[in-house]
């Protein structure tokens, strides 16, 4: 009898603690929307007002959407789906009634475009969750399915739920086609595996020190690539090693060093030009946050008057959706922090775009910047970005090898390519006489474009708040990235393109060390003294000698002895070409 009571109370307690979670995973968001961020609908029984208001766009080339859910305790559900137009047939691939699984599981909703009409069509997914004596939890999830006009689209009788085909010839033909496709697939898999193992074997053959023939070829073209000679060394670099690095003064002395000057941007005018209505943005969960600022992905819904669908709802006048990377301040930020935030964010404002430069795409507010009295929120600064987000965060994940967070195995040629790309961005801003003053992995974004990694140099807005451990104060009440700075910048605050090149060398080191912390063993107050004594960052594992020589060139004490950013680009490109011969 006592045992029965214990079981009863245990079940009652479980019902009282019951909760449900539902979300779209990072992998599914990346597959369907190109954004590697999780979209939470319900978390421990709490419904996200942000996410449930969001109309998830299911593009024409996407046939289904996967949701992930689980329950804590016993949770019963009911679900049904409806479409506002018969041109779309939504199908939920789970029973319409049942119990939410306790372990994380996926279920899918299929969206079938029927007929020949094109346009966007609203689909609503209704859930009711029941547990214990609590009020039922009702959730409505909205999707918008895009259907492209094409002849021969599968109709409503497209082989679902008992539709039978009696034509034996058709079955035979279908069977034959399936066999052919399977055979072709096996051949493709076999060929892919062979190519993969050959490529892996070839990359594994790349030594830390490239072959003598490669070094000789570099020596024979010394005038064309002055940075890429290989100098065998044991232990950390010394002053003599740095002085003898293959970037002679003759190659660097002709450089025109660009001093750092304020850009004097008219912030109000820039905000007016970049303004967008905040209601057009659907914020996703936090990606990073500090004390005063935060970073999120968001969906920018842009108005397009050309709409072929017949849905009359005002929401559906928004046709194009674009993923953006956003920065904004929290409510506890001060006006001084707002001024600094906007000044930093607009560093690249109004200069010619570059594929490796991340510039502000728009600034959103619920009010209007031409009527300041209507602006009660902090501006949402938006960058076009569909990728992994912050480079430093991405490199750290890759170094730790956490596949659940998107870790990748980065090969030498990929890292050299990223180094070349970010150097190209630095050379681009220097061409417009803009000095960055804070070049580092924390101020870059990384994505995958057409199967290749692409890095973009970004401004330093919010970096001091998001990465406080990278900034230190030397008694002047100014937090500075001392371990990325040149000696003249530390001692005399002399910022220039040459100081940027020093920081660029540290960024190359961050890439090759997969987000390592430079000079981690040195106190910030001692960095300047140690640099003058010849202390330099050690060569990372698997970093080719020629690339490390480029870093040493960037770290020469005298600013006039350093190469220009353009010379660094040329050197890295030449090295990349040579390296590709071994891949």
Swiss-Prot record:
Give all residue intervals belonging to the WIF domain.
Answer: 22-147
Instruction: Please name every pair of cysteines joined by a disulfide bond in this record.
Output: 113-147
Q: Where in the cell is it found?
A: Cell membrane; Basolateral cell membrane
Check the record and name the InterPro entries matching this protein: Kinase-like_dom_sf (IPR011009), Prot_kinase_dom (IPR000719), RTK (IPR050122), Ser-Thr/Tyr_kinase_cat_dom (IPR001245), Tyr_kinase_AS (IPR008266), WIF (IPR003306), WIF_sf (IPR038677)
The GO annotation for biological process reads: asymmetric protein localization involved in cell fate determination; axonogenesis; cell surface receptor protein tyrosine kinase signaling pathway; establishment of anatomical structure orientation; morphogenesis of an epithelium; polarity specification of anterior/posterior axis; polarity specification of proximal/distal axis; positive regulation of anterior/posterior axon guidance
Binding residues for ATP? 287-295, 327
Could you list this entry's UniProt keywords, alphabetically sorted. ATP-binding, Cell membrane, Disulfide bond, Glycoprotein, Membrane, Neurogenesis, Nucleotide-binding, Receptor, Signal, Transmembrane, Transmembrane helix, Wnt signaling pathway
Against SUPFAM superfamilies, the record matches this protein to: Protein kinase-like (PK-like) (SSF56112)
Residues annotated as domain Protein kinase: 281-583
Q: Does the keyword DNA-binding apply?
A: no
Q: Which Pfam families match?
A: PK_Tyr_Ser-Thr, WIF
Give the residues annotated as coiled coil.
Answer: none
Please give the Gene Ontology molecular function terms for this protein: ATP binding; protein kinase activity
**Residues annotated as glycosylated:** 30, 46
Function as written in the Swiss-Prot or TrEMBL entry: Has no detectable kinase activity in vitro and is unlikely to function as a tyrosine kinase in vivo. Receptor which may act as a receptor for Wnt ligand mom-2. Plays a role in controlling P7.p vulva precursor cell lineage orientation during vulva development. Regulates pop-1 asymmetric distribution in P7.p and its daughter cells. Plays a role in the migration of ALM neurons during embryogenesis.
Protein name, UniProt field: Inactive tyrosine-protein kinase RYK
């Amino acid at each position: 009898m006592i045992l029965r009571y214990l079981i009863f109370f245990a079940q009652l307690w479980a019902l009282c603690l019951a909760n449900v979670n539902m979300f779209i995973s990072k992998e599914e968001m990346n597959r369907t929307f190109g954004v590697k961020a999780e979209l939470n609908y319900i978390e421990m029984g709490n419904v996200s007002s942000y996410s449930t208001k969001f109309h998830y766009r299911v593009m024409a080339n996407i046939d289904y959407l996967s949701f992930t859910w689980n329950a804590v305790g016993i949770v019963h559900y009911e679900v049904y789906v409806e479409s506002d137009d018969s041109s779309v047939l939504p199908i939920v691939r789970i029973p319409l009634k049942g119990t939410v699984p306790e372990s994380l599981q996926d279920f899918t909703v299929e969206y079938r475009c029927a007929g020949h009409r094109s346009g966007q069509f609203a689909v609503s997914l209704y859930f009711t969750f029941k547990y214990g004596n609590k009020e039922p939890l009702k959730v409505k999830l909205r999707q918008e399915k895009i259907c492209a006009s094409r002849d021969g689209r599968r109709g409503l009788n497209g082989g679902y739920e008992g539709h039978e085909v009696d034509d034996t010839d058709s079955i035979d033909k279908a069977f034959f086609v399936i066999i052919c496709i399977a055979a072709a697939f096996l051949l493709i898999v076999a060929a892919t595996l062979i190519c993969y193992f050959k490529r892996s074997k070839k990359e594994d053959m790349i030594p830390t020190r490239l072959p003598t023939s490669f070094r000789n070829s570099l020596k024979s073209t010394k005038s064309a690539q002055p940075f890429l000679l290989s100098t065998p060394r044991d232990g950390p670099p010394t002053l003599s090693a740095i002085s003898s690095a293959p970037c002679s003064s003759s190659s660097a002395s002709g450089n025109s060093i660009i001093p750092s000057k304020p850009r004097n941007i008219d912030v109000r005018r820039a905000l007016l030009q970049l303004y967008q209505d905040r209601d057009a943005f659907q914020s996703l969960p936090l990606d990073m946050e500090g004390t005063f600022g935060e970073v999120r992905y968001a969906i920018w819904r842009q108005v397009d008057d050309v709409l072929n669908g017949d849905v009359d709802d005002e929401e559906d006048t928004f046709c194009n959706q674009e993923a953006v990377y956003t920065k904004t301040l929290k409510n506890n930020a001060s006006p001084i922090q707002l001024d600094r935030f906007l000044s930093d964010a607009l560093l690249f404002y109004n200069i010619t775009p570059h594929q490796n430069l991340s510039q502000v795409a728009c600034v959103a507010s619920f009010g209007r910047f031409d009527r300041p009295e209507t602006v009660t929120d902090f501006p949402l600064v938006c960058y076009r970005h569909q990728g992994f987000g912050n480079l430093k965060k991405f490199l750290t994940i890759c170094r730790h090898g956490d596949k659940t967070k998107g870790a990748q195995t980065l090969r030498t040629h990929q890292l050299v390519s990223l180094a070349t790309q970010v150097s190209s961005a630095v050379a681009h801003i220097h061409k417009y006489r803009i000095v960055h003053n804070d070049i580092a992995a924390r101020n870059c974004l990384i994505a995958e474009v057409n199967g290749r990694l692409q890095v973009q140099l970004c401004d330093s807005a919010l970096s001091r708040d998001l990465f406080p451990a990278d900034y230190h104060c030397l008694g002047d009440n100014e937090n500075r990235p001392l371990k990325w700075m040149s000696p003249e910048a530390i001692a005399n605050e002399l910022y220039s393109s040459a100081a940027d090149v020093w920081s660029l060398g540290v960024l190359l080191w961050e890439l090759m060390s997969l987000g390592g912390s430079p000079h981690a063993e040195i106190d910030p107050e001692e960095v300047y003294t140690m640099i003058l004594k010849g202390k330099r960052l050690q060569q990372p594992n698997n970093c080719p000698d020629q690339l490390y020589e480029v870093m040493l060139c960037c770290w020469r004490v005298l600013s006039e002895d350093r190469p220009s950013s353009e010379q660094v680009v040329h050197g890295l490109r030449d090295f990349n070409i040579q390296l590709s011969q071994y891949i």
